[in-house]
Amino acid sequence: MSTELVTTQKLLVKLPKNVDKPQEQLDLQYEQSLAALVALKDEQTLPAEIRQHADRLTKWLNRESDSMENMDTSTRLTQIAMVQPTTQHAAKPDNAKPGDLFSTVGDLISRPFKFRVLYGFRTHVRFQQGEKAPVCGSPDGVLGSPLGKCDLCAFAPMGTQKIPGTTTPKPWNDQKPSECANQLTFLVVDSTYSNLYEIQFSKTSIKAGNVLATLAKGSGDKLWNKEFMLETEKQANAKGTYYILKVSPAGNPIDDGHDKVCLALKSFDVAGRQKFLRVFYDSY
């Protein structure tokens, strides 16, 4: 198959940047990034504490697998979730109350949760009213399955809608609420370099995700040189009370010598995501 275009009966789709490589090259890139991450625990140019952090985080990624070869970040990363009054998540701790944070492996997360950003990406997901499963989803905010190109979709998320027949964004006042929602996902490491998580911002918390994206960009390529705090805030409307995520800076930029660890973690996860996107586009 061409590395430039994916042809389906529905449409012609251009592969995204950095995914337009042969699958073999993406596989090799993934294997090399994994090897570089694993090797950090033995890199003598790094202080012992940082080598220990690298080893601990690598094991955290691999905590459910007996072999590093079986690591799959797309299914293995733990998410941080928020308790709403109606939350029925199977991993919610018994002692968790509305407004609390918990991990999808069942741990209660202390608030505020202090973290550093490794990288982030945007996705789209569409739910029809009353349905628990999405009717369409896009892992990159560009191509959705099964409805096709996001920028041509009648259900494009508010803020991304285009003037019909063009690629020109509609004026903000003409943007309408949609069943499809923007989601911002960030790969983060906690401030003690003990755990890796994904934090997803959507719906009423998308504003906090946009704030985090803007603040993190101020660090340039080294997003991890800034620390942030994740909190929740109680809100109310005609339907009752609910909670939203809030993000704020935790202090001045910090360079604590973890550049190699953070870059290796980012590179490994990005390589895994690129592999996943290539498979997604090829199977469309």
Which sequence ranges carry the predicted segments?
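OB-fold ssDNA-binding interfaces and closely related basic DNA-contact patches used
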Residues: S2-T192, N237
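Generic surface-pattern signal
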Residues: D20, A39-D42, N62, D66, ...
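Intrinsic-disorder-associated interaction segments
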Residues: Q23-D27, E43-L46, I50, F201, ...
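Intrinsically disordered, low-complexity N-terminal regions enriched in serine/proline/glycine
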Residues: Q29, L118, T192, L196, ...
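Exposed alpha-helical structural elements
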Residues: R56, S205-T214, G257-L263, K275
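Long, highly charged low-complexity segments enriched in Glu/Asp and Lys/Arg with interspersed Ser/Thr
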Residues: H124, A154, N237-Y284
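Extended serine/threonine-enriched, polar tracts that run as long, contiguous segments within proteins
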Residues: P177-N252
